[in-house]
């Protein structure tokens, strides 16, 4: 279903890209929004999949606490980092917003009951917040904002 949506969105973007736009027109703003959503989806998919697969619950008897196994998935990490670096070259703010979107996805899954273990959810959230440094993306301090809104409304 996601693939069909992405292809449909690609078709819309391709059709819109061939036409000339007036910068103030509604269709130009719609084109920008669709392009941003497509870019975000392209990055979100491999990165959220990398985070989701990074920690898996190891099967244990019911009387023992669940343990986690760290999965080394270099291919998914490379795909995630490659996409995140491409976005960061254009805008560090966009890269940060993508990381925040992944964290929000994880939190929604946690609250909807997808995660039964709080430790797994916390480990994945921590990994997500560290994605930029894992991928070697560091902010340009000359152009970074003084404070960045984070999930939960906390300002840093």
Swiss-Prot record:
Write the signal peptide boundaries: 1-19
* Principal location: other
Where, per UniProt, does this protein localize?
Vacuole, Aleurone grain
Q: What are the coiled-coil residue ranges? A: none
GO cellular component terms attached to this protein's record: aleurone grain; vacuole
- Give the Pfam families listed for this entry: Gliadin
**Can you tell me which family this protein belongs to?**
Belongs to the prolamin family.
Q: What does this protein do?
A: Seed storage protein; serves as a source of nitrogen, carbon and sulfur for the young developing seedling.
Q: What is this protein called?
A: 13 kDa prolamin C
| Species lineage | Eukaryota, Viridiplantae, Streptophyta, Embryophyta, Tracheophyta
Chain's gene name: PROLM25
